[in-house]
Curated annotation (Swiss-Prot):
Lineage of producing organism: Eukaryota, Metazoa, Chordata, Craniata, Vertebrata
Source organism, top-level taxon: Eukaryota
GO biological process: C21-steroid hormone biosynthetic process; cellular response to peptide hormone stimulus; glucocorticoid biosynthetic process; mineralocorticoid biosynthetic process; progesterone metabolic process
Its membrane topology: Peripheral membrane protein
Family of the protein in this entry: Belongs to the cytochrome P450 family.
Cofactor(s), by name: heme b
Protein name: Steroid 21-hydroxylase
SUPFAM superfamilies: Cytochrome P450
Amino acid sequence: MLLPGLLLLLLLLLLAGTRWLWGQWKLWKLRLPPLAPGFLHFLQPNLPVYLFGLAQKLGPIYRIRLGLQDVVVLNSNKTIEEALIQKWVDFAGRPQILDGKMNFDLSMGDYSLTWKAHKKLSRSALVLGMRDSMEPLVEQLTQEFCERMRAQAGASVAIHKEFSLLTCSIISCLTFGDKQDSTLLNATHSCVRDLLKAWNHWSVQILDIIPFLRFFPNPGLWKLKQFQESRDHIVMQELKRHKDSLVAGQWKDMIDYMLQGVEKQRDARDPGQLHERHVHMSVVDLFVGGTETTAATLSWAVAFLLHHPEIQKRLQEELDLKLAPSSQLLYKNRMQLPLLMATIAEVLRLRPVVPMALPHRATKASSISGYDIPKDTIIIPNIQGANLDEMVWELPSKFWPDRFLESGKSPRIPTFGCGARVCLGEPLARLEFFVVLARLLQTFTLLPPPDGTLPSLQPLPYTGINLLIPPFQVRLQPRNLAPQDQGQKSSTG
């Protein structure tokens, strides 16, 4: 009995070895991007900048080892746009990751007819379903935020947490409808922050590099699953509440809109059937992808303006000239505030929402910049690295909003990704940047705390999705514009 078992084992080893050699032989025939030596690249503390440094030696496209596979890193706008715009179908896939709800997830779901239907419904719910209410909602909640900050009477404030609560509240109203009571909102906000903190922990991130470690005891992974259960409980309760009160042809929020969209698609028997779980994961993606990311960008903007009070003063002069405090702030008229829009663009260039876009997967054999890219290769666009390219940007590390005021001088920045995988929440995030910063600078002067300490502009060690700023405090000094001056200002409405 022992001999047949050994023969079977040898046969399996022979087949595995033959398959590996066949795969290597096929790769030897290809013109692959250069391979960066070493195995510990993803353990670097400031990963996007480190990867861009490798590009200075190897070129804008190269390979690095990630566990047992190679990953291709793109470090220039040209290579990113070729892959994600010109050849978007070839690179629209997603690799399998730790969170396994791949058939229902939007941000990490693989490319398919179902995924396309899911993306179309979710984007329609945000852009069309909430078209008339999204802008007034952001304005209202921002005004309430400013009133809360005014009550601080110039005291030092941990601004990131306040921004995070604001963005969570906006998403909550868009998805769940009526404003949540403070207890439920705080519970939702804490759940989202805890979930992201657990996800970004090294003990979880390493599982995508060394997958077999997930079979060993891992307190970090256990915490992540606990927070996922809490998240799902909150969303499922809201789905049930919405189904119980749903009226055909009417909607008050995104969940209503998407639930009816799923029913219509089911009745029409369209390809790529959607289910209630897809609605669930759309809500999850909005909270996870739109709370801390937007709050982090707003925090970076405040930090840069504390370091550059002269730019803050120019922004306030622009707002005082073009926008009366009591006037309606319309996003369609945003170009009446060119310096504000340039400042937002510069913050997004230096500190992009997601510095390294979520990984893509080659759905077929293709090429980028003349290099062969085999099917199923993982592609990582290094957006922050591309934004630091001296061949494209003058003084790329300098905070200089005026670069965007020079006509024709500023290339497109793929801050929210591009092509089929462009971020679902981009319209909401851009609206929030515009409204929150406009109202904040119109209402307050940003000052350092009494001891004069300025925030660090160096990101925390990069281990997850977001580029996080070290905690800091700011004083929001009310400006108290004179009523007679306010009446002389024009309106962007």
